[in-house]
Amino acid sequence: RESILKEAGYNLFNVPAEKVLIDLLTDSGTSAMSAEQWAGLMRGDESYAGAKSFFVFERAVRELTGMREVIPVHQGRAAERILFSIVGGPGKTFLSNSHFDTTRANVEVSGASAVDLPVPSALEFARSEPFKGNVDLKALEAKIQELGPETIPLFIMTVTNNSLGGQPVSMKNLREASEICRHYKIPLFLD
């Protein structure tokens, strides 16, 4: 492992996937699948359009969210690309407890700015404390007042906070951040 890391310049994105036994870089697509999930792949309707599996998915998403439009994407980064190409752009700022790397990239590609507002304890790595993924609520409100709510298309709460070590966010912090966002009429995007 040491030689692999050294060869990669200590950059985890340069480590070939076949050299990784357990992926601790991300939680995307690395979980074990059940026998039923694998069987579902084998039974999958691979029609170009009108696949039965899409309608099952669409119905479930509509029931959960109440939203009519459902656009499936292969991963979160593709959804981010669509979202930020629509709501992003120069002069806009996206606030977050901490942007995930692909989220930040998609925000910045749109011409907008990404600002992280983690609680101070999040950066004290040796300190053991619950909910180090929380947003700093005072900093959030101060930044909204500084920039003006009209320049902030949405606030992003990343749960769990991957960029800061997978730290959890408390429900209390999420509720209070939501109240601040509602007060300033800024949509809260739960990632």
Each language-model region and where it sits:
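N-terminal glycine-rich, Lys/His-bearing helix-loop that initiates the first secondary-structure elements
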Residues: R1-Q37
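Conserved N-terminal alpha-helix of the aminotransferase class I/II PLP-enzyme fold
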Residues: S28-A78, S98-H99
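Short hydrophobic alpha-helical segments of the AMP-binding
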Residues: V61, V107, C181
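Short glycine/serine/threonine/alanine-rich loop segments
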Residues: M67, A112, I186
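Conserved beta-loop-alpha segment that forms the PLP phosphate-binding cup at the N-terminus of a helix
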Residues: R68-T93, T103-A105
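General beta-strand structural signal in soluble alpha/beta enzymes
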Residues: I71-H74, S96, D116-L117, M157, ...
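Substrate-binding/gating loop at the entrance of the active-site cleft, primarily
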Residues: S96-S121
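Active-site phosphate-binding strand-loop segment of PLP-dependent enzymes
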Residues: F125-L190
